[in-house]
Amino acid sequence: MAFIAALGLLMAGICPAVLCFPDGTLGMDAAVQEDHDNGTQLDSLTLASINTDFAFSLYKELVLKNPDKNIVFSPLSISAALAVMSLGAKGNTLEEILEGLKFNLTETSEADIHQGFGHLLQRLNQPKDQVQISTGSALFIEKRQQILTEFQEKAKTLYQAEAFTADFQQPRQAKKLINDYVRKQTQGMIKELVSDLDKRTLMVLVNYIYFKAKWKVPFDPLDTFKSEFYAGKRRPVIVPMMSMEDLTTPYFRDEELSCTVVELKYTGNASALFILPDQGRMQQVEASLQPETLRKWKNSLKPRMIDELHLPKFSISTDYSLEDVLSKLGIREVFSTQADLSAITGTKDLRVSQVVHKAVLDVAETGTEAAAATGVKFVPMSAKLYPLTVYFNRPFLIMIFDTETEIAPFIAKIANPK
């Protein structure tokens, strides 16, 4: 079974300009690498905790705007995109962006924030044998527009952002140029990030992220069966349900929050945390989402033999406008006429008018010969004295983690897998 996800974030700005961002991340230079070797004040674990705080705040706002619907987004990519934008911001606009990302500016300098992102994104982009994580960014600049060299150099040095020239006076051609780039970088999963462009567009900043991995213990397609999934108060829907028996995997039963937590590991440095609230307890679990809750779940996980594990096979996509959501998190000025993005163009005539986030999440069997027979599926009969069945036949949460950095590239809520 492969787990595939791709996301795009578009920030469009108007005045004489449009800024665009899809989900993504970027790289760094030798100077940043040297700082990494000597250590940095903002280490990856601290950044992961801050990003988790931002992720859960963003998740709660998305749930309010999209009740009882599927949610898929990349908090890492959104925060990295906003961090790139902050390179061009000044004054209160800059402070709002960084504080909205949950950074305490009295404790962490702007330079440390960018270096921290650079270290993290470089580690994520390092080639891996069994898990594919590809992140990056690109600047599409109006060919008649002068962008400050310092901004371009910072974006390239800290985030390794590629730069391209585009003719936004020909919106259809410019749109094709951008969408073709994103489609290629996300392996065809994000087919149309940009749906329309204004001729007043000045610059488009595209961020993307693509993730693909195989389970350490795969599901057998022959065991998949049709099953009911209870999506809210409506009639149950029929979905393909993957099945596995006698799996030993990290497990925790949270009686306080009335939910079950199961970790399924990938073949490389990644894992997925599945949170299954009891019937009618999803809102309680969602309200409790915070870094401390996640820490409790992770620290409480213990290997447990699950006699039967049933998980839906699904492919879902989401499309969000994030201006209102980000405003709720305190990032407001950048969308107003008071926006100060003068470190991009040298003038204050630029603001962000639109933030569009697109995501695709695909969980499906591959039929490949992944490491299925490692012994973890077989246990003594005595272990079945207290049989345990975990049945994901109602709404649940997924959090994907890079186990080296503890960062969560993706968070999802599966309200209806059909």
UniProtKB/Swiss-Prot annotation:
Residues glycosylated per entry: N38, N104, N269
Classification via Gene3D superfamilies: Alpha-1-antitrypsin, domain 1 (2.30.39.10), Antithrombin, subunit I, domain 2 (3.30.497.10)
Pfam families cross-referenced by the UniProt entry: Serpin
Alphabetized UniProt keyword annotations: Acute phase, Glycoprotein, Protease inhibitor, Secreted, Serine protease inhibitor, Signal
Region (RCL): 367-392
The keyword Repeat belongs to this UniProt entry's keyword annotation: no
A GO biological process held by the record: response to cytokine
Coiled-coil region list: none
Signal peptide range: 1-20
GO cellular component: extracellular region; extracellular space
Location, primary (coarse class): secreted
Inducers of expression: Expression is induced by bacterial lipopolysaccharide (LPS).
Keyword Secreted: yes
Family per similarity comment: Belongs to the serpin family.
Note: The single human alpha1-antichymotrypsin gene (SERPINA3) is represented by a cluster of 14 individual murine paralogs.
Domain comment as written in the entry: The reactive center loop (RCL) extends out from the body of the protein and directs binding to the target protease. The protease cleaves the serpin at the reactive site within the RCL, establishing a covalent linkage between the serpin reactive site and the protease. The resulting inactive serpin-protease complex is highly stable. Variability within the reactive center loop (RCL) sequences of Serpina3 paralogs may determine target protease specificity.
Protein name: Serine protease inhibitor A3N
Organism (species): Mus musculus
Lineage: Eukaryota, Metazoa, Chordata, Craniata, Vertebrata
